[in-house]
């Protein structure tokens, strides 16, 4: 059985990913986080979890740096723009969590893979796994 904290963080990562996708189409961090967090709740007047806001605002603040780090791990001839928005945002979220949080690296990688399975396909999940695993290996 999954612990409540892990389940909660997993759900917040999902909300963070949804907020990041929303930000691709023009909104602000708080609005994107609020919608992602409350869209399926009856009570929408809630305080947003700090973990959610920290993830989304952190990825947004370091977007260019994260993209450079991701690009360094792409195959020759590939650019960040060639990736789908889903893959880009999952990789940004994964790299940000690996480099900026105390989350164990393997947990951050696994969570990104699970999100890829939910929002994309197995091919994308394998790609996310490969790139983030390479990133973790080279960072050690």
Swiss-Prot record:
Belongs to the NusB family. GO terms for molecular function: RNA binding. GO terms for cellular component: cytosol. Disulfide bonds: none annotated. It comes from Streptococcus pneumoniae (strain 70585). Involved in transcription antitermination. Required for transcription of ribosomal RNA (rRNA) genes. Binds specifically to the boxA antiterminator sequence of the ribosomal RNA (rrn) operons. The keyword Hydrolase does not apply. Keywords: RNA-binding, Transcription, Transcription antitermination, Transcription regulation. The lineage of its organism: Bacteria, Bacillati, Bacillota, Bacilli, Lactobacillales. This is Transcription antitermination protein NusB. HAMAP family: NusB (MF_00073). One of its GO terms (biological process) is DNA-templated transcription termination. It comes from the Bacteria. PANTHER family: ANTITERMINATION NUSB DOMAIN-CONTAINING PROTEIN (PTHR11078:SF3), N UTILIZATION SUBSTANCE PROTEIN B-RELATED (PTHR11078).
